[in-house]
């Protein structure tokens, strides 16, 4: 009996010490590395999708992808949500200025830390392609209406 109480007390201490270390996302959103993500299958052009994402949460934007691992996580979310549907999904990157040069920043203002362009793609508004399981970046005309992926910084699980 004493051992049972001691084990339960130990588990309780571990549970409380871990509390607050996880990110908390709203219902229907998925968390990865302190951020919340959601794939929306409603179709919007790039600018309207970015505006919509900004309305979803504090600091929300179309998803910026900072690493291959994050790209794989987002790709899996999109593939699961859009299995039998659209072939492209907007992310938070677009060309800026007169030329076809890509912006040096994502729509949330963060720097581009890695790139995963499909070969032969020029750079306009950027979408992920179903044919690459939503892993490779493709340019698309910004006025096309596509599904999109929003991202924002999660609230700590225990804001105290």
Curated annotation (Swiss-Prot):
Disulfide bonds join 25-36, 53-150, 125-142. Residues 32-151 form the C-type lectin domain. GO terms for molecular function: toxin activity. It comes from the Eukaryota. Residues 1-23 form the signal peptide. One of its GO terms (cellular component) is extracellular region. Its main location: secreted. It is found in: Secreted. InterPro entries: C-type_lectin-like, C-type_lectin-like/link_sf, C-type_lectin/snaclec_domain, CTDL_fold. Keywords: Disulfide bond, Hemostasis impairing toxin, Secreted, Signal, Toxin. Gene3D superfamilies: Mannose-Binding Protein A, subunit A. Pfam families: Lectin_C. Expressed by the venom gland. PANTHER family: MANNOSE, PHOSPHOLIPASE, LECTIN RECEPTOR RELATED. Belongs to the snaclec family. Interferes with one step of hemostasis (modulation of platelet aggregation, or coagulation cascade, for example). This is Snaclec subunit A.
